[in-house]
């Protein structure tokens, strides 16, 4: 919708406002990998591109003179989930990579090193032809997310593959 330059500038303006007004415990941006996975990426590719996008924000904010410890805690992530085995650890792997990079490359404090993430179960895993099994698919994906210690979770409705979800 927007050019990359405009989007980064807009997000930078929002983040500068958050810092100036001391807005805490509210996420200025949710760095999303959900759409990447729903477009066909496997879990490893989703993670790689999402973290890359996150580091793009970090580098841009730093280039505008913001302090890593001022904006780091305001970043969150949004991942898709599926039944591939890698989904059982996507959050743990993301947290480890993020924390190490934030500490070792950027000198971030503990709070800024924390990766907070939301999981939504995969819409593309739901089938119109086997709709009765969609609840099972979603349940397995939700269990992966819970066992991986996600911060928040959205589960899709069983009929999301064929219509606007009912419940």
Annotate each language-model stretch with its function:
Residues 48, 99-100:
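Conduit-forming functional cores of very large proteins
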Residues 39-48, 82-93, 121-135, 163-167:
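Short glycine/threonine-rich loop-to-helix capping motif typified by GTGT followed
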Residues 74, 96-97:
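Amphipathic alpha-helical scaffolding segments
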Residues 135-142:
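Short, acidic/polar
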Residues 98, 148:
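Conserved, mostly hydrophobic/aromatic
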Residues 140, 151-167:
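Active-site or pore-adjacent capping/gating segments
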Residues 1-81, 86-87, 105, 112-118, ...:
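Catalytic alpha/beta active-site cores
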């Amino acid at each position: 919708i927007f050019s990359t330059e405009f989007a980064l500038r807009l997000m930078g303006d929002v983040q500068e406002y958050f810092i100036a007004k001391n807005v805490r415990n509210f996420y200025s941006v949710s760095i999303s990998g959900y759409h990447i996975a729903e477009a066909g990426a496997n879990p490893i590719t989703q993670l790689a591109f999402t973290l890359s996008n996150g580091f793009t924000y970090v580098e841009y904010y730093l280039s505008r003179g913001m302090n890593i410890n001022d904006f780091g805690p305001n970043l969150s992530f949004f991942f898709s989930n599926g039944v591939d085995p890698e989904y059982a650890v996507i959050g743990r792997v993301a947290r480890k990579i993020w924390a190490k990079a934030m500490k070792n490359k950027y000198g971030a404090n503990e709070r800024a090193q924390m990766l907070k993430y939301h999981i939504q179960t995969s819409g593309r895993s739901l089938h119109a032809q086997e709709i009765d099994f969609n609840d099972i698919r979603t349940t397995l994906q939700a269990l992966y997310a819970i066992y991986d210690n996600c911060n928040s979770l959205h589960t899709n409705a069983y009929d999301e593959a064929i219509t606007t979800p009912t419940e």
